[in-house]
A protein has these predicted regions:
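Short acidic/histidine-rich active-site segments
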Residues: 368-384
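Cysteine-centered catalytic environments shared across enzyme families
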Residues: 1-338, 356, 552, 557, ...
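A mobile, often basic/glycine-rich helix-loop segment
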Residues: 380-410
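Adenosyl-5′-phosphate
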Residues: 1, 7, 21, 115, ...
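Short, basic, glycine/proline-bearing loop/turn elements
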Residues: 339-347
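Short glycine/serine/threonine/alanine-rich loop segments
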Residues: 321, 346, 368
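Short, flexible loop segments at the rims of nucleotide/cofactor-binding pockets, characterized by
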Residues: 191-192, 346-352
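C-terminal "lid/loop" region of Rossmann-like NAD(P)-dependent oxidoreductases
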Residues: 214, 298, 405-412
Length: 621
């Protein structure tokens, strides 16, 4: 895990001080060393910050060269199957000078070009310069675990880096993307327009999309292409639920094994939910000799009814884990809020990001560099509660015999009407229009018309009309008319997951930690997408096939746990803290000066207050 930087210039030669400025600002991503390289003609330069994970020697330093200097790489991430790829390349006569996954990636590209991406199991963002062909090849992993931002300067340069702030260090204008800001403030979401997924909160800065590569020529022409996608047509109706559970276990075990490869200490995040508990219990089972106890890291919230400590303790009691806890509170939040915003770079939807921040800080204090985490399961296994609505609608629309059984099971297992639209509900007083706004506002808004409406449904006085009038139109986003599988695809590959991965990358790298996500093995995700919907939602349960797969290694209370929380802090209580209220008021005044908030404004809810706070600090300070 590292930080990358680079410049391709068609005008003035690249200067080493430019590259150094770009790597110095992301020291946190790689405190173990840095490197800079400029080619002989001066039109290409790479920078790198190193966090040593695989092969701790200087032989693995970057930028790295291969093929008698023809190829040069700057790479951030991990190639988990590098040992298998290396063995295959050695059989073909390739020789290596290091034991790193970086050199394996570079050699594989030299051998296969763009096709190398098909063979990578990992998380990555990298750039390779081919001195013979004079092309810059850039690529990002399938789900977007690792970031890649880029911009074009006014003086004829293509500039890229892991983080947005690097680009500002070399002259890219820090100009706010007003439309993205409007969507965030007006619609309460951090999701970008799916028609323009490369957009960021800054006009001049773009992000390379997940599962895409980009070729840049010396005259700065670019060609972008998707190299991987989920096969929506593939569906296995022959497999039994037990065989599917067994295969799930096999693929997950293999994914965890690969993600345990490291030359530095490895631990796990533990929230007490099904996903993180599965990883901790699986590692415990794999660690048969128990020579080193698995360290787990968790956030607890004192005197909060949704604290998940009892579930964490069940996992700890059933394994040989060495638990460590942090207790985020409003005082810690006030103390670190500006730091969190500086690292996150763009607005984020709530203080749960801070809980993850505290977990990463704790891991650093315990000298554990790599953490396995459970992100990615919900998006493939229909883990969020609103998927019930999508699934039941699909069953009803198709006149499926499963509809009545699933509706009854849902009502028996959950609050009878929670999250269901009026056509399913016994409570006619509240429909999906009301319920799902609270349940899943980010996803729900994505498929609504992009039209002006109050952040909390009580008028538009909070935002300045001169600001909002620029964007008030009848323009619509694509309507969501598909079923469960289509919405799972949207969550994985269009919106939703990419934001969570952004938060995770910035939080972990702020403390020079590496987060690895076993549920995002593309082999596993492809398999899960081939399963019928009823293996994911069945008998009122989400993630049904997963519960079946791991019920023998998990505490029963977690396997068949109905509720889902996910590091939810006591936000309402925190927002009543005097220091936080002062921060909020200061932020609203700042946004008044920017012409974004109405001077006669009145915040109509906690979301208005939070959005003002995070926008002011991330974008205007």
């Amino acid at each position: 895990m590292c930080g990358i930087a680079g410049i391709l210039s068609k005008s003035n030669p690249v200067q080493v001080q430019e590259l150094k400025a770009m790597t110095d600002i992301i020291y946190h991503r790689g405190p173990d060393g840095d490197g800079h390289w400029i080619n002989e003609t001066g039109n290409v330069g790479f920078g790198h910050r190193r966090l040593s994970i695989i092969d701790l020697s200087n032989h693995a330093s970057q930028p790295m060269h291969f093929g008698n200097g023809r190829y040069t790489i700057t790479f951030n991430g991990e190639i988990y199957n590098y040992l298998e790829l290396r063995a295959s390349l050695v059989k073909e006569g390739v020789t290596f000078s290091s034991n790193s996954d970086t050199e394996v990636l570079l050699a594989l590209y030299a051998k296969k070009g763009v096709a190398c991406l098909e063979e990578l199991d990992g998380m990555f963002a990298f750039a390779i310069w081919d001195e013979l062909e004079k092309v810059l090849f850039c690529a990002r992993d399938r789900f977007g675990e690792k970031p890649f931002h880029y911009a074009f300067s006014n003086d004829g340069k293509f500039i890229f880096g892991s983080e947005i702030k690097q680009l500002f260090e070399v002259g890219i204008e820090r100009k706010i993307n007003q439309k993205i800001l409007y969507n965030f403030l007006q619609n309460h979401h951090v999701l970008h327009d799916p028609r323009n997924p490369e957009q960021t909160f800054y006009q001049k800065v773009q992000r390379l999309e997940p599962a895409h590569y980009m070729i840049v020529t010396p005259d700065l022409r670019i060609q972008k292409k998707r190299y991987w996608d989920l096969d929506m047509a593939r569906e296995n109706h022959e497999i039994s639920i037990q065989d599917a559970a067994d295969k799930f276990y096999e693929l997950m075990e293999q994914s965890v094994k690969l993600r345990l490869r490291s030359d530095v200490p490895v631990g796990s995040s533990l929230s007490g939910g099904l996903d993180s508990s599965t990883i901790v219990c699986l590692i415990d089972k794999l660690n048969t000799n128990q020579s080193i106890r698995q360290k787990t890291f968790s956030a607890r919230f004192k005197n909060f009814e949704r604290d998940e400590g009892k579930f964490m303790q069940m996992v700890i009691d059933s394994t040989n884990a060495d638990p460590h806890f942090t207790f985020p509170d409003e005082n810690k939040f006030v103390s670190d809020f500006k730091k969190v915003c500086w690292h996150q770079e763009e607005p984020f939807g709530g203080p749960s990001v801070f809980a993850q921040w505290e977990v990463m800080k704790l891991a650093k204090e315990q000298n554990v560099t790599v953490l396995l985490d459970g992100q990615g399961a919900d998006e493939s296994l229909a883990g969020y509660h609103y998927f019930f609505h999508t699934y039941l609608n699909e069953l009803k629309r198709n006149n499926s015999p499963l509809y009545e059984n699933e509706l009854t099971a849902y009502r028996n297992r959950h609050n009878p009407n929670y999250g269901l639209e009026q056509s399913h509900s016994t409570n006619k007083q509240k429909s999906i229009e009301d319920k799902l706004k609270d349940l899943v506002r980010p996803i729900y808004r994505t498929f609504r018309p992009l039209k002006p409406e109050s952040p909390s449904g009580q008028g538009t006085d909070f935002l300045n009309k001169e600001f909002t009038s620029q964007f008030e139109s009848n323009e619509k986003l694509p309507e969501h008319t598909g079923g469960l599988k289509e919405q799972l695809y949207v969550n994985n590959c269009v919106i939703g997951l990419n934001n969570l991965l952004r938060f995770a990358d910035r939080n972990s790298m702020a403390f020079s930690r590496e987060m690895r996500l076993p549920f995002l093995s593309h082999h596993l995700v492809e398999f899960l997408f081939s399963l019928p919907n009823e293996f994911k939602i069945q008998d009122g349960w989400t993630k049904f096939v997963m519960r079946k797969a791991f019920e023998t290694i998990l505490p029963k209370e977690i396997t068949w746990r109905v509720d889902k929380i996910g590091y939810e802090p006591p936000q309402s209580r925190w927002m009543e803290n005097k220091e936080i209220k002062d921060l909020i008021e200061s932020s609203i005044v700042d946004l008044e000066k920017e012409g974004i908030i109405n001077k006669k404004r009145k915040a109509t809810g906690k979301s208005d207050e939070w959005n003002s706070l995070v926008v002011s600090e991330t974008l205007f300070n």
